[in-house]
């Protein structure tokens, strides 16, 4: 059975492009004695949900089968320059305006053959304004104010 987690995303702006990242951790971050089976890569399906300008609920698949690399932090780019039709900034919501659903997408055969795991190790979700982040093989960097100051996270 595949697993699902839903993140409620607050305070998004309309017509502003976001780069949407899912950050996953390796099994070794949780257990330094993780077995080879526990250290298998994940295969995930990611869907964004939001309300349109008429208030109707919409769903859009961002990724149908994105995979992680075992034994390292993964910064998975789910969408680039993604724009929402309506802002939810400052709303107190009984029903979230924006959701991100992450689901394992591993077949029984893939699990039986030990190709992928259904265990999710999610560190965080990041909605980064488009154009201020840079992802390379060894680091993820954000320059938030365009003033030369930058923040980065090493990937390995």
Where are these predicted regions, by residue range?
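Extracytoplasmic
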Residues: 1-156
